[in-house]
């Protein structure tokens, strides 16, 4: 099987290329004799980019993920909102690295070249730099960073010159490759923050480490100790013009480094990584490590010099707010063909996938021979349109539109069960593979449930990427007009802000607003990505075709468009084109599809639903079983709403541009605008976001004098009392000075005492627990940690 054949690393797909990379890497290192730091000449500019896997079926995609991706670190960083929290930028995936103590070098090497540092080229370069070159600047920055750390600030630790030298010598020994007695039983000693800083100077390329800020307890998940690894490392020993400005992005969790690489994709997301963390209702800048005091004052300038910093709009925590955050642009794949291992691995994956398909097809045929009544859905061309089942992340195909294969199979299974209720045998009891237009809309699609998706290998890939990692690599913008944010598949095509606004509006709106839902087509009542005057693009094409040509009335309706003779409209408004007559009385245009269907019976009545290939029964008022259920639902809905939707929606002047005072035609590519108005709308959104940011800053400045003025008035000294003192010379207010008067004459000792003072947070930074007076203001866990480690 492919699960055994698929290599567990990229370099195993082509050993010759891997050897060529390992030969070129040490030759590219330049070691000056004048004390300048060792560095790479050209190979530090290469970047790896992973191939897309959404074209494979979920079962085979799972095999690829198991082979290459570190899903534990991926899931941990995403759950902590440190990785892939911003939908405006591309997703990053974590590749596996060896956990032998040299994972920092393995991850860095794999990010650039696709091979791990098994030859210790990067580690030897790090050790030789610390041992042979002038490291006084590195040591000075390390001492400054250590003095600002929590261990020195809170404990009052003080080092003399001998202590500093011993610690620095220990850091140099940790970078050595000759460590038979490494700590924690690893082959090599683990590296620290200063080693990352030296490495980025050797590479002349920034390094961004994404990690949590706290080391958390494995048992309770509570904060245990602060983590300082995450942040930005700039090659400050080099001028910015001599450095490569696209950063290396690494992930860190559980003392392990992994490379975080982008995916080859043509979606609208920006190839960048945010330079902020989203935490507790605010955006916090990533820490820039090993800055001197003068450099810390010009941090923003340094970031723009060493990185390609751009501003991107993101949704704020409050509804309707937009913030501009800084992000660093990432490099695209630029490895030469002779050393590009991703292409070879992708070719190998495609080869194994063909073999896997053949084996799966053979097994499916054997299973189908044993159970011939089990239906199967053929795989045809995929469409770049989402399945219309709410919350379904898959894409529709030509033969199953407007549904994906998973939802289509589930609906067919439901159809196979329903005809059993009807005792009369007929064609409606047989499962149909290719359904007609009206037949395809017998049901509104149910909400998608991943647990109900069909199991077992399919003969061909499904219509969508997996919800695990790659479900939004082809993500589109929110379907709300004028919204600049990226959609979320869990919110049925809307972004989080628009989804919350719709939920709030739906809770206050009456039930009759269902026909006015902007996300539904008023003609076919299907959930669509965008509507044109209330109808979807498929219905619009059909109505315009009918208006332009009289011959189009004889054509069968589109597979997405509801027929004009919807059963819910037969009683209210029978039109001359309605196809509610039975048998031979039906018009030829309505029976064109039924006439081509095999199994046509003479002497029995066709279903009253236009385009339905099955036969009706007198018990169901001339409908087949499925159409009769739809007829009852629509009739009940029409009676409840009190009004009938129009039989057809038409445009009078095609699609006008949404821009003000613009007479040109709009385009779906530009969200209903023409190209000129679309560019103006984008600029307006950008300036509005910038203006909102400035207003927030100005309001914060105005609030400062008010708070200082209010805090200048003295308050009562009792912790549970918030009254203002009438006289500055007293400490207690009048109520606290005369408690008996406040309690009243009927008070006695049995009444409850005043409320206790509010609990204070633990003194340890970033700790979520409450402090304890017996533990000197710390929580029990932090107090025990402080007692153990001083």
UniProtKB/Swiss-Prot annotation:
<dbReference type="GO" id="GO:0030177">
    <property type="term" value="P:positive regulation of Wnt signaling pathway"/>
</dbReference>
<dbReference type="GO" id="GO:0072666">
    <property type="term" value="P:establishment of protein localization to vacuole"/>
</dbReference>
<feature type="region of interest" description="Interaction with ubiquitin">
    <location>
        <begin position="224"/>
        <end position="227"/>
    </location>
</feature>
<keyword id="KW-0833">Ubl conjugation pathway</keyword>
<dbReference type="GO" id="GO:0005634">
    <property type="term" value="C:nucleus"/>
</dbReference>
<feature type="active site">
    <location>
        <position position="100"/>
    </location>
</feature>
<dbReference type="GO" id="GO:0070530">
    <property type="term" value="F:K63-linked polyubiquitin modification-dependent protein binding"/>
</dbReference>
<feature type="region of interest" description="Disordered">
    <location>
        <begin position="447"/>
        <end position="468"/>
    </location>
</feature>
<dbReference type="GO" id="GO:0042802">
    <property type="term" value="F:identical protein binding"/>
</dbReference>
<dbReference type="GO" id="GO:1902042">
    <property type="term" value="P:negative regulation of extrinsic apoptotic signaling pathway via death domain receptors"/>
</dbReference>
<dbReference type="GO" id="GO:0061043">
    <property type="term" value="P:regulation of vascular wound healing"/>
</dbReference>
<keyword id="KW-0677">Repeat</keyword>
<dbReference type="GO" id="GO:0034148">
    <property type="term" value="P:negative regulation of toll-like receptor 5 signaling pathway"/>
</dbReference>
<comment type="function">
    <text>Ubiquitin-editing enzyme that contains both ubiquitin ligase and deubiquitinase activities. Involved in immune and inflammatory responses signaled by cytokines, such as TNF-alpha and IL-1 beta, or pathogens via Toll-like receptors (TLRs) through terminating NF-kappa-B activity. Essential component of a ubiquitin-editing protein complex, comprising also RNF11, ITCH and TAX1BP1, that ensures the transient nature of inflammatory signaling pathways.</text>
</comment>
<feature type="region of interest" description="Interaction with TNIP1">
    <location>
        <begin position="369"/>
        <end position="775"/>
    </location>
</feature>
<dbReference type="GO" id="GO:2000347">
    <property type="term" value="P:positive regulation of hepatocyte proliferation"/>
</dbReference>
<keyword id="KW-0511">Multifunctional enzyme</keyword>
<dbReference type="GO" id="GO:0050869">
    <property type="term" value="P:negative regulation of B cell activation"/>
</dbReference>
<keyword id="KW-0479">Metal-binding</keyword>
<dbReference type="GO" id="GO:0071947">
    <property type="term" value="P:protein deubiquitination involved in ubiquitin-dependent protein catabolic process"/>
</dbReference>
<feature type="binding site">
    <location>
        <position position="495"/>
    </location>
    <ligand>
        <name>Zn(2+) 2</name>
    </ligand>
</feature>
<feature type="zinc finger region" description="A20-type 2">
    <location>
        <begin position="472"/>
        <end position="507"/>
    </location>
</feature>
<dbReference type="GO" id="GO:0071222">
    <property type="term" value="P:cellular response to lipopolysaccharide"/>
</dbReference>
<feature type="binding site">
    <location>
        <position position="736"/>
    </location>
    <ligand>
        <name>Zn(2+) 6</name>
    </ligand>
</feature>
<feature type="binding site">
    <location>
        <position position="536"/>
    </location>
    <ligand>
        <name>Zn(2+) 3</name>
    </ligand>
</feature>
<feature type="binding site">
    <location>
        <position position="767"/>
    </location>
    <ligand>
        <name>Zn(2+) 7</name>
    </ligand>
</feature>
<feature type="binding site">
    <location>
        <position position="392"/>
    </location>
    <ligand>
        <name>Zn(2+) 1</name>
    </ligand>
</feature>
<feature type="binding site">
    <location>
        <position position="521"/>
    </location>
    <ligand>
        <name>Zn(2+) 3</name>
    </ligand>
</feature>
<dbReference type="GO" id="GO:0035872">
    <property type="term" value="P:nucleotide-binding domain, leucine rich repeat containing receptor signaling pathway"/>
</dbReference>
<feature type="binding site">
    <location>
        <position position="624"/>
    </location>
    <ligand>
        <name>Zn(2+) 4</name>
    </ligand>
</feature>
<keyword id="KW-0963">Cytoplasm</keyword>
<dbReference type="GO" id="GO:0032715">
    <property type="term" value="P:negative regulation of interleukin-6 production"/>
</dbReference>
<feature type="region of interest" description="Disordered">
    <location>
        <begin position="550"/>
        <end position="583"/>
    </location>
</feature>
<protein>
    <recommendedName>
        <fullName>Tumor necrosis factor alpha-induced protein 3</fullName>
        <ecNumber>2.3.2.-</ecNumber>
        <ecNumber>3.4.19.12</ecNumber>
    </recommendedName>
</protein>
<feature type="site" description="Cleavage; by MALT1">
    <location>
        <begin position="439"/>
        <end position="440"/>
    </location>
</feature>
<keyword id="KW-0863">Zinc-finger</keyword>
<keyword id="KW-0395">Inflammatory response</keyword>
<dbReference type="GO" id="GO:0032720">
    <property type="term" value="P:negative regulation of tumor necrosis factor production"/>
</dbReference>
<feature type="modified residue" description="N-acetylalanine">
    <location>
        <position position="2"/>
    </location>
</feature>
<feature type="region of interest" description="Interaction with RIPK1">
    <location>
        <begin position="386"/>
        <end position="453"/>
    </location>
</feature>
<dbReference type="GO" id="GO:0003677">
    <property type="term" value="F:DNA binding"/>
</dbReference>
<feature type="binding site">
    <location>
        <position position="627"/>
    </location>
    <ligand>
        <name>Zn(2+) 4</name>
    </ligand>
</feature>
